[in-house]
Regions:
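A structural signal for small-residue-enriched, beta-sheet-centric alpha/beta enzyme cores
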Residues: 1-57, 61, 72-317
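Active-site-adjacent structural elements in enzyme catalytic domains
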Residues: 65-70
Length: 317
């Protein structure tokens, strides 16, 4: 769900049943809700959904709307006679992109969270300028929602969905090549070859101004049967894909957070390297998803938008 006037939005991912989940936060200025319970030592094991939202701290209201939707469906942790949905959340800072930010007493993000939860039941979502990525930007191009998936040699499916609102850049210098270029599959973000060599200018750090708040938030998921500790390891390895795809990442004013979810549909062979392969695949999927989020983004349908151009405006085929 998104609001074209506000230039912000919410993405909700709902689970068919409680899924094992954990998370890692390496950004210096995160905004999250109920992520402490994802620590492997905490009691609650499964989540009913995860929310990725714009709006900075205001966006944390979005989980409330998702909770309401799930409770109406009688979904949640069974505590005596009460259902308590478990829905962690992370937010991005998109308050400086123009748009109407004086929404007053209207529960804007709660309403968008509720709408996003209803929309999630369809199982489909749009890439680019949509949902939690509607108002997202990067240092040099419009950001957005990205996604990618793959199958491991062991037969497990791994996927990633990300809101790319990076403080840095996902592309190399002034050219069209992505830092995630080496892991691209089937030209999914333009098929631009990775440069054979990098110049000093290519390596120069690019940021949104001096040190503005930003954040890239993501979910990686697998059908493998994992423990909470193993999901945490998968999130940690997946986060390396974020660092490969964006320069810089995990900065002092970033809130970079990666959730990992396991649907428990396929057993994991713990005698070999299957868990390591899951983490590697999750990192590759996240790097690809970041590039796709930028490649697919278009400018918001609002004349009030303040931000960089869309990638394909600058690098048209």
């Amino acid at each position: 769900a998104d609001d074209r006037d506000v230039i912000s939005g919410v993405t909700a991912i709902l689970c068919e049943r409680p899924n094992i989940a954990s998370a890692i936060t390496r950004g210096g200025a995160p905004g999250t809700r109920d992520t402490a319970l994802l620590d492997p030592e905490m009691t609650v094991q499964g989540v009913d959904g995860i929310v990725l939202s714009g709006g900075s701290v205001y966006g944390l209201d979005a989980a409330g709307g998702v909770l309401c939707h799930l409770r109406q469906k009688n979904i949640g942790l069974d505590v005596a006679a009460v259902r308590v949905p478990i829905v962690p959340q992370a937010i991005t800072f998109d308050l400086l992109n123009g748009g109407k930010k004086d929404w007053g007493r209207t529960p804007l993000y709660w309403n968008m969270g509720y709408a996003a939860a209803k929309a999630a039941e369809g199982g489909r979502f749009q890439l680019g300028t949509a949902g939690g990525g509607y108002g997202a930007t990067t240092a040099n191009y419009k950001g957005g929602i990205g996604s990618a998936s793959m199958r491991t040699a062991a037969g497990h499916t791994v996927g990633a969905i990300v809101v790319v609102n990076a403080i840095g850049s996902a592309t190399i210098g002034d050219g069209p090549a992505f830092w995630a270029g080496p892991v691209e599959i089937d030209g999914e973000y333009g098929g631009v070859p990775f440069p054979p060599a990098l110049s000093d200018k290519d390596r120069t750090m690019r940021m949104k101004g001096a040190s503005p708040p930003s954040t890239t938030i993501a979910i990686v998921a697998t059908d493998a049967s994992l423990t909470k500790q193993e999901a945490r390891r998968m999130a940690q390895m997946a986060d390396d894909g974020l660092a490969r795809a964006i320069r810089p990442a995990h900065a002092p004013m970033d809130g970079d957070t990666v959730f990992a979810v396991a649907t428990q549909r396929r057993p994991l062979d713990r005698t070999g390297t299957a868990l390591t392969e899951l983490g590697l695949s999750a990192a590759d999927c996240l790097a690809r998803a970041i590039a796709r989020g930028i490649f697919e983004a278009t400018l918001p349908a609002s004349p009030a938008y303040v931000g960089p151009p869309a990638y394909q405006q600058v690098h048209s085929s």
